[in-house]
From Swiss-Prot:
Compartment annotation: Cytoplasm
PANTHER family recorded: LEUCYL/PHENYLALANYL-TRNA--PROTEIN TRANSFERASE, LEUCYL_PHENYLALANYL-TRNA--PROTEIN TRANSFERASE
Enzyme Commission number(s) from the entry: 2.3.2.6
Single GO cellular component term: cytoplasm
Keyword Ligase: no
Function comment: Functions in the N-end rule pathway of protein degradation where it conjugates Leu, Phe and, less efficiently, Met from aminoacyl-tRNAs to the N-termini of proteins containing an N-terminal arginine or lysine.
Catalysed conversion reaction: N-terminal L-lysyl-[protein] + L-leucyl-tRNA(Leu) = N-terminal L-leucyl-L-lysyl-[protein] + tRNA(Leu) + H(+); N-terminal L-arginyl-[protein] + L-leucyl-tRNA(Leu) = N-terminal L-leucyl-L-arginyl-[protein] + tRNA(Leu) + H(+); L-phenylalanyl-tRNA(Phe) + an N-terminal L-alpha-aminoacyl-[protein] = an N-terminal L-phenylalanyl-L-alpha-aminoacyl-[protein] + tRNA(Phe)
Name of the protein: Leucyl/phenylalanyl-tRNA--protein transferase
Record-linked HAMAP family: Leu_Phe_trans (MF_00688)
GO molecular function: leucyl-tRNA--protein transferase activity
Disulfide bonds, paired cysteine numbers: none
Length: 194
């Protein structure tokens, strides 16, 4: 069973958990190339800007954390397995109750339409996963998160492992050594998400 202290220690040292749903195991990952979103240069695409300006979604934080993490854990059309196991869900629910894990939610007509969750430590936000039930809902939540982190003075938005979706949102890859320097700088900040 993963403990809260295990998660906090691992993230401070550049590791994060991934479950293998077939094996029922959890591995600790520390990729050589780390995906991060540069907070100072992120700009939503024109099409996303239009969706944001239309006000299709209402953004809320931490009102449906468990719903968000469980939606993120659902298998995707292209991936039949999920890396978010019940063990990971349980420890992140504890982290949420401690005020360390947070959800950003897009709501539409009173229904949860999409969102994301992650872990906040110092000036670092570790984006864990995102999901959507309605088109662009997770992207709107992501754009809101970036703006919010900027305003609060965060310096690191860790996206962990690059994929085409993250790249389309402006994520870049940096070498492990550079990531660790950025992480150390971010963790030294006295910032709280809420």
């Amino acid at each position: 069973m993963i403990k809260v202290e295990d998660i906090l220690r691992a993230y401070r040292h550049g590791f994060f958990p991934m479950a293998d749903s077939r094996e029922g195991t959890v591995s600790w990952c520390q990729p050589y190339q780390r995906a991060v979103v540069p907070l100072d240069t992120f700009r939503p695409s024109r099409s996303l800007r239009r969706v944001i300006d239309e006000g299709q979604f209402t953004i809320k934080t931490n009102t449906a954390f468990e719903k968000v993490i469980r939606a993120c854990a659902l298998p995707r059309a292209v991936e039949k397995e999920t890396w978010i196991s019940e063990e990971i869900i349980e420890v992140f629910l504890k982290l949420h109750r401690l005020g360390l894990a947070h959800s950003v939610e897009s709501w539409q007509n009173g229904e949860l339409a999409g969102g994301l969750y992650g872990l906040s430590m110092g000036g670092a936000f570790f984006g864990e996963s995102m999901f959507f039930f309605e088109r662009d809902a997770s992207k709107v939540a992501f754009a809101w998160l970036v703006g919010y982190l900027r305003k609060k003075g965060f310096s690191l938005l860790d996206a962990q492992i690059m994929n085409p979706h993250l790249e389309s949102l402006g994520a870049i890859e940096i070498p492990h050594e550079e990531y660790m320097l950025r992480l150390e700088h971010a963790l030294a900040k006295k910032i709280f998400f809420i």
